[in-house]
């Protein structure tokens, strides 16, 4: 991902936020931020992607990324909505049940990310 970001930046692509696939190690998250912010791009940030992974893996990635300055959020759509949406389509959940499941899981992800960010601020 570092090479891709560098190549895109060198070609003139200058997003304010880079979407980064889930990373297991803090050091890798730090490298991604350093790459995104290289050469005077201090205002550029990153978000972590869920890649449709299972809850456990996404929770690990969110916790790891949130602890690093420069990661400001996440995009975990499929991880959040896939199972409840499939259950609704298969008529094993009502619409209201699916909506509640999606909202509840998303709230858990927000709380997890924000909690890890708060820990970063105290460090």
Functional labels for PLM-detected ranges:
Residues 4-28:
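Catalytic beta/alpha-barrel core
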Residues 1-8, 58-64:
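Short, acidic/polar
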Residues 21-121:
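Catalytic-face loop-and-helix region of soluble metabolic enzyme cores
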């Amino acid at each position: 991902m570092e090479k891709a970001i560098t190549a895109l930046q060198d070609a003139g692509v200058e997003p304010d936020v880079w979407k980064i696939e889930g990373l297991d190690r803090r050091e890798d998250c730090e490298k991604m931020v350093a790459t995104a912010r290289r050469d005077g791009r201090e205002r550029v940030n990153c978000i972590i992607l869920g890649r449709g992974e299972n809850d456990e893996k996404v929770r690990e990635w969110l916790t790891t990324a949130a602890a690093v300055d420069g990661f400001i959020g996440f995009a975990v759509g499929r991880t959040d909505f896939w199972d409840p949406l499939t259950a609704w389509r298969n008529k094993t959940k009502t619409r209201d049940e699916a909506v509640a499941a999606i909202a509840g899981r998303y709230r858990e992800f927000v709380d997890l990310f924000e909690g890890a960010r708060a820990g970063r601020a105290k460090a």
